[in-house]
């Protein structure tokens, strides 16, 4: 009859997870997201597990959710998953008041972020090396 309201924007071999309103600035979150881009999913989980940054555990939870979505919802092979995209976006800014001297005030801004992780199934590396040799 009509098109679905939200057509699938991902490929058949991709799955995603989205976390909204994380209490960290986008600049800091992007540093951690850069550690896992274009890495195999198992290696990315290991990197985040042993990272010293506070936000790394929230990123790890989102990555594990994307892996679970790939396995359960899209029947993808977990061993072949690669982090294709780790997108960081701005969210709300919470503004606070800070009293200063001589009756003045200043503003404290607390930034929030969105995180979207897309994992995709890649073919085995042995097949790609055979194609290059041919």
From Swiss-Prot:
Transcription among keywords: no
GO annotation, biological process: translation
Top-rank taxon, per record: Bacteria
Annotated keywords: Ribonucleoprotein, Ribosomal protein, RNA-binding, rRNA-binding
Molecular function in Gene Ontology: rRNA binding; structural constituent of ribosome
InterPro entries attached to this UniProt entry: Ribosomal_uL22 (IPR001063), Ribosomal_uL22_bac/chlpt-type (IPR005727), Ribosomal_uL22_bac/org-type (IPR047867), Ribosomal_uL22_CS (IPR018260), Ribosomal_uL22_sf (IPR036394)
Gene3D superfamilies: Ribosomal protein L22/L17
Keyword RNA-binding: yes
GO CC annotations on file: cytosolic large ribosomal subunit
Subunit structure and binding partners: Part of the 50S ribosomal subunit.
Functional summary from the UniProt entry: This protein binds specifically to 23S rRNA; its binding is stimulated by other ribosomal proteins, e.g. L4, L17, and L20. It is important during the early stages of 50S assembly. It makes multiple contacts with different domains of the 23S rRNA in the assembled 50S subunit and ribosome. The globular domain of the protein is located near the polypeptide exit tunnel on the outside of the subunit, while an extended beta-hairpin is found that lines the wall of the exit tunnel in the center of the 70S ribosome.
Family: Belongs to the universal ribosomal protein uL22 family.
Protein name: Large ribosomal subunit protein uL22
Species whose genome carries this gene: Gluconacetobacter diazotrophicus (strain ATCC 49037 / DSM 5601 / CCUG 37298 / CIP 103539 / LMG 7603 / PAl5)
């Amino acid at each position: 009859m009509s098109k679905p309201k939200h057509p699938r924007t991902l490929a058949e071999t991709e799955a995603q997870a989205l976390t909204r309103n994380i209490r960290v600035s986008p600049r800091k979150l992007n540093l951690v997201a850069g550690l896992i881009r274009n890495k195999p999913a198992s290696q990315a989980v290991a990197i985040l597990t042993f990272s010293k940054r506070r936000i790394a555990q929230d990123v790890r939870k989102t990555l594990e959710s994307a892996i679970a979505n790939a396995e359960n919802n899209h029947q993808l092979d977990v061993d072949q998953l690669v982090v294709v995209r780790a997108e960081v976006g701005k969210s709300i800014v919470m503004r606070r008041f800070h009293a200063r001297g001589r009756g003045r005030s200043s503003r404290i801004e607390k930034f929030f972020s969105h995180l979207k992780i897309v994992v995709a199934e890649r073919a085995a590396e042995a097949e790609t090396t055979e194609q290059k040799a041919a």
